[in-house]
Amino acid sequence: MLTDAEKKEVTALWGKAAGHGEEYGAEALERLFQAFPTTKTYFSHFDLSHGSAQIKAHGKKVADALSTAAGHFDDMDSALSALSDLHAHKLRVDPVNFKLLAHCILVVLARHCPGEFTPSAHAAMDKFLSKVATVLTSKYR
């Protein structure tokens, strides 16, 4: 559960980043594929080259999902229910990959929003992304 102060930190940081969702989401995915090559197996049908339209489009989906989550702190389970079903039952994504992507998202935010990426914002965003990962893996059980 995020505190009110953490919600404010996430809202402020994600508010700045969300306007660059496609760019930041694509960069996070590219970092994911470079740092953790086994994650590419879920995207074998994608053009994984730098700047590909498919990576940008999926990056935007990731960013949009995070915007949805940030808009529903107290009802994230319902807000992300369909996405959780998709990843658990159709795509069958290994749950560890959400944590790996969360790490890459933090790196991208630190790179692009250094002034806003304070230690407290970092901690709040990490907690938020962990909550998102928990919600997305809740249907695996």
From Swiss-Prot:
Positions of modified residues (Phosphothreonine): T134, T137
Keyword S-adenosyl-L-methionine annotated: no
A Gene Ontology term for the protein's cellular component: hemoglobin complex
Keyword entries, A-Z: Acetylation, Heme, Iron, Metal-binding, Oxygen transport, Phosphoprotein, Transport
Entries under InterPro entries matching the protein: Globin, Globin-like_sf, Globin/Proto, Hemoglobin_a-typ, Hemoglobin_oxygen_transport, Hemoglobin_pi
Family that this chain belongs to: Belongs to the globin family.
Protein name: Hemoglobin subunit alpha
Organism encoding this protein: Ornithorhynchus anatinus (Duckbill platypus)
